[in-house]
């Protein structure tokens, strides 16, 4: 019998040498083409966080929106966006972070988080953890806390889970893929 996790993992295509030589791209768009796999993804994340005292769900640009919004809806919680610069219409707060070659910046609305909010961050994939670390810093600057982050995919050898654990963030991942 196929488990929900088997269904999810088998629905994710691995594309070798994309976007560049030596990279194996994990394509979640194929998971979205299998309604039972997409539903299982949302259901498993919702079940994990139903009784954790979460007050807001954040999705990181852009595939975190795909999974974060339905999770927030199922939990009956507000959903907030973390985006690249100049994509949000109201006043924002920004956080820069280092990439392998350069720097990037994330933004969110200044009124997205209230003092004392217990925030769940959702993204499709955990690699180095840089995006989520920057998101944690944004939340903290606005007075919230992040104890939990959920991912569809983890690439364990890239160290993101350890990096986030060192920040006090517990990571929940549905499937691990070796190789990147």
From Swiss-Prot:
It comes from the Bacteria. Its main location: cytoplasm. The keyword Glycosyltransferase applies. GO terms for cellular component: cytosol. GO terms for molecular function: adenine phosphoribosyltransferase activity. One of its GO terms (biological process) is adenine salvage. It catalyses: AMP + diphosphate = 5-phospho-alpha-D-ribose 1-diphosphate + adenine. Catalyzes a salvage reaction resulting in the formation of AMP, that is energically less costly than de novo synthesis. PANTHER family: ADENINE PHOSPHORIBOSYLTRANSFERASE (PTHR11776), PHOSPHORIBOSYLTRANSFERASE DOMAIN-CONTAINING PROTEIN (PTHR11776:SF7). Homodimer. Belongs to the purine/pyrimidine phosphoribosyltransferase family. This is Adenine phosphoribosyltransferase. It comes from Haemophilus influenzae (strain PittEE). The gene is apt.
């Amino acid at each position: 019998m196929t488990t929900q996790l088997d269904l999810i993992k088998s629905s994710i295509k691995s594309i070798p040498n994309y976007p560049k030589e030596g990279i194996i791209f994990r394509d979640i768009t194929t998971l979205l083409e299998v309604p039972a796999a997409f539903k299982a993804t949302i259901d498993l994340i919702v079940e994990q966080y139903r009784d954790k005292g979460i007050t807001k769900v954040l999705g990181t640009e852009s595939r975190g929106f795909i999974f974060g919004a339905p999770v927030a809806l199922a939990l009956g919680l507000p959903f907030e966006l973390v985006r690249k610069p100049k994509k949000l219409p109201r006043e924002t707060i920004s956080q820069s972070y280092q990439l392998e070659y350069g720097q990037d910046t994330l933004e969110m609305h200044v009124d997205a988080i209230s003092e004392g909010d217990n925030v769940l961050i959702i993204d499709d994939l955990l690699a180095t953890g840089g995006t989520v670390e920057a998101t944690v810093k944004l939340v903290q600057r606005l007075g919230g806390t992040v104890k939990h982050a959920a991912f569809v995919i983890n690439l364990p050898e890239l160290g993101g889970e350890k990096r986030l654990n060192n920040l006090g963030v517990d990571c929940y991942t549905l499937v691990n893929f070796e190789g990147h």
